[in-house]
């Protein structure tokens, strides 16, 4: 595999994973407050 393909896949996975994580973290912060 090319480095460009690996980089694109890693960026896509980070975006997909970071989305729900941000929502969960914000929900936890609101719950704690």
Curated annotation (Swiss-Prot):
GO cellular component terms listed in the entry, alphabetical order: chloroplast thylakoid membrane; photosystem II
Cleaved signal peptide residues: none
Cystine residue pairs: none
Membrane topology annotation: Single-pass membrane protein
Annotated keywords: Chloroplast, Membrane, Photosynthesis, Photosystem II, Plastid, Thylakoid, Transmembrane, Transmembrane helix
Subcellular location(s) per record: Plastid, Chloroplast thylakoid membrane
GO BP term, example: photosynthesis
InterPro entries: PSII_Ycf12_core-subunit (IPR010284)
Chain segments annotated as transmembrane: 5-25
The family this protein is said to belong to: Belongs to the Psb30/Ycf12 family.
Role this protein plays: A core subunit of photosystem II (PSII), probably helps stabilize the reaction center.
Stored HAMAP family: PSII_Psb30_Ycf12 (MF_01329)
Subunit structure as annotated in this protein's UniProt entry: PSII is composed of 1 copy each of membrane proteins PsbA, PsbB, PsbC, PsbD, PsbE, PsbF, PsbH, PsbI, PsbJ, PsbK, PsbL, PsbM, PsbT, PsbX, PsbY, PsbZ, Psb30/Ycf12, peripheral proteins of the oxygen-evolving complex and a large number of cofactors. It forms dimeric complexes.
Protein's UniProt name: Photosystem II reaction center protein Psb30
Source organism of the structure: Pinus koraiensis
């Amino acid at each position: 595999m090319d480095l460009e393909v690996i980089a694109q896949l890693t960026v896509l996975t980070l975006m997909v994973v970071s989305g729900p994580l941000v929502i969960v973290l914000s929900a936890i912060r609101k719950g704690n407050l």
